[in-house]
Amino acid sequence: MTMPTKSFHRTDRVSAQVRRDLGTIVHAAVRDHGLPSVSVSDVEISRDLAHAKVFVTALQQERSAEAVKGLKEIAGQLRTQLARAMKLRHVPELHFHYDDSVDRGERIDNLLRDLDDIGPEAAPDAQDAEPR
């Protein structure tokens, strides 16, 4: 009996490696360039490995635009450092984006918590509702 195997494409492996290496590089660059603190949350690489969408989250959400702008300005330097760290013939061009999934998740969590605070007595009773 053969076990089903999950296929991992090269882009998935490269993406994971870029995320690990770039996470370390970005952490140092943020400190060196006085940028707001960010961390790399995800990396999506194009099939041809020419471009990488780098998603970052900011500790201070209100300074996220400043952080992404700063990373875009030093993207060439970061790509050079990434090339030194990785054994790839061509290192993808880096495109930085703010990852708002954490903010959206937090907003949903707050909404759910607010619903819990309201309690079931505020919800319309199923028997009182008119059929549609």
Curated annotation (Swiss-Prot):
Subcellular localization, as worded in the UniProt entry: Cytoplasm
Presence of the UniProt keyword Cytoplasm in the record: yes
Coiled-coil spans in chain: none
Domain of life: Bacteria
InterPro entries registered for this protein in UniProt: KH_dom-like_a/b, RbfA, RbfA_dom_sf, Ribosome-bd_factorA_CS
GO cellular component: cytosol
Keywords: Cytoplasm, Ribosome biogenesis
GO biological process: maturation of SSU-rRNA; ribosome biogenesis
Summary of subunit composition and partner proteins: Monomer. Binds 30S ribosomal subunits, but not 50S ribosomal subunits or 70S ribosomes.
Family under the similarity heading: Belongs to the RbfA family.
This protein's name: Ribosome-binding factor A
